Amino acid sequence: MLFRSWFLERVHVMKRGTGFRRRGASATVLWSDITGINVNEGNQGTSNLLSTFTNLKAADLAHALHSLTLKRRVEVARALEDERLADVLQEMDENDRVELLTELDRERAADVIGEMEPDDAADLLREVGKDKAKALLDLMEPEDAEDVQRLMKYEDYSAGGMMTTEPIVLSADSTVAEALAFIRQAEIAPGLASQVYVCRQPLETPTGKFVGVVHFQKLLREPPATLLGQIVDKESATLQPDADINTVSSMLASYNLLSMPVIDENDRLIGVVTVDDVLDHLLPENWRHKDDMRVR
């Protein structure tokens, strides 16, 4: 006899009828789009849970894991690839991700942190305590650890503490076509894709002298062969690394920007603060678990 595994992908749903109507409107929807249903983990093994979670976005998977017991949560986390688990940890609240990270062996935890965005990794290491943070940093790839340590020296709610160190940085003799090619990369977050940063060599943060920015919309209006140095905005607003969150949020709102460059005392670009970085710090700690705040 041949046994097959069945996985739920779509469900037919119907609204409850009102008045004399026996049936309400109906539709067929993806199971991954259904919210408000708790997973009954008692009847599911880890492999079945993983199959259920395959197509979930990282934020939705983090929400689903929150409803599981710690034991089952750890089982799922151990089965996820490093990059996938890193994405999920970035979407968890402080208590959940610290608890989960503590259950992983240190080598695996260090590998996962190395896959996180540097600013999120710095936030997580601040949360686990100095001793454990040092142990994990020692196990990380030196280049990854250096980026994270650079961020950890800033206050959590400052521009330096919230910034990412991996914006799109190009030289003045790069072309519009080259800039758009970077922006098209799937892994570039929307906030970072909103503009490119023009600097002198070196182009990795901390860069050479910061020149200015070119907004994505400007790139779309210019011929592909145009040099960035010809269209760069040299009067763009910038932030100091010690700027507090109120200053950062006010400037983003005032200039209607999705991101802003952070410049040190030597006029070097050291990072970029995005709107989502600021929102993560402004929203209540438990906002991720409020069902009425989730997109439906």
Model-inferred region functions:
Residues 1-296:
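Hydrophobic packing positions in regular secondary-structure scaffolds
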